[in-house]
Amino acid sequence: MVPSVHIIGCGLIGTSIALSLRKSGYKVSAEDINADHVAQARDLGVLATLSEPQFGETSGQRAEVVFICVPPGVAAETINVAFGKFDGALILDVSSVRRSIIDELDRELTDSGRVMGAHPMAGREVSGPSSARADLFQDRIWVLTQGSEASRVTAAMVITDMGGALVTMEPADHDRAVALVSHVPQLVSSALAAQLIDAAQSDLAISGSGLGDTIRIAGSDPNLWSDILQGNATEISRVLRQVSNELAELSTALEDKNRVRIEQTLRAGNEGRARIPGKHGSGTNRFESVNVMISDQPGALAELFAGVGVLDINLEDVRIEHVMGRPSGIVQLFVPIGESEELESGLYQRGFDTRGRQ
C-alpha cells in the first residue's frame, strides 16, 4: 500500500512531485504560502491549499511522507514545524544544500532518523508550478542523506515510483559535489550571460547554439539561487577560486601567445568532459548526428520524428537551432555511432531536407 504524501511548497519541484506521485496512484495533498502558486497547482489538478501561519494545519490528513519543497533559507524552520505537525511522518527535504540546514535543525530532529535530505538532480531554467512536469524526475538521480534504514526504504520506494535513481552520500560530500556539478556552473553561466547586457545587438544576432547551450541555465530564478548559493558558500567559493585561477592563467597565456598553455586548458577540458557518466551510468556517450532543415510550423517536428520512427532508429538526443531571418530551423538528430548514414539516407528518401552528418 502506498503511503499518503503531503507537499509543503508548490513551486516547480513540489508541483512536479505531486503530479508524478498522483500519476502513480498516490494520495497527495499540498500547500503553499503563495496564493498564485496554489491556484496554478490546482489548475494542474493538485489538491493544494493556502498555508495558514503555522503551515501543516490545513493539510486535512495525517501524511506518512512529507516533502519540504521550500527555499533553503527557510527549509530548517519549515522542517522543525513539520516534524511536530506530522507526527511519525518521514520528512524529505529536497534542498540542494545540506550542512547549513542540518546546523539549524533541532537536535531532536537530526537524531530521530525520520528527517532526510532527498535532493533531486533535476530542474529547469524556469520556475513555478506552471513549469511543473510529471516526468521531471524520470531517470534522474536523487541524493539521499541521513535518515534511518527504515526511512531510506520508504524514501526509495516513493522516489523510484517517480522514476528516480538513488545515490546515498554524507551531507558534506553532497555539498562538495553539488558545488562543482551544479552551483558553480550556474554562476559561470550567469556571469557569461551578464556580459551580453551591454553587447551590440548586431553582435548578438550572430550568436549560435554554443552560446545558447552555455547560458541556458542563466534564466534561473535569482531569488531561489541566491538562497542556494549562500547555503553552500564555502564549497562554492573553493571551486570558484580554482576556475578563476584557470581563467587568469589562460588570459596570460593568450597575451603571451603561449599556444602550449592554451592547448593544455582545452585538452584538460576534453578530459574532464569525458569523465561525465553517459547513458545508464556508462562512460561519456559518443554519438553521430544528422542535420535536417524543417519549417517553423505546427506538426513539422512531429512529422520528422515519425519519419525517424519508421526507420526504427533510436534517437539519443535532439537539438534545434533556429535560422535567423527565415521561418525554419535546423534539427540535429543524435544517434549511436554507425547509424547516421542509414538515418540520413532514409530521411532523404522520404523527402526530408537533410543537411549532412557530423
What is the role of each PLM region?
Residues 1-53, 57-60, 65:
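NAD(P)+-binding Rossmann beta1-loop-alpha1 motif at the extreme N-terminus of oxidoreductases
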Residues 35-36, 96, 149:
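Helix N-cap at the beta1-alpha1 junction of Rossmann-like dinucleotide-binding domains, i.e.
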Residues 54-92:
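Rossmann-like NAD(P)-binding element
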Residues 78-130:
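Rossmann-like NAD(P)(H) cofactor-binding subdomain of soluble oxidoreductases
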Residues 272-358:
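A conserved regulatory-domain signal marking ACT and ACT-like small-molecule sensing domains
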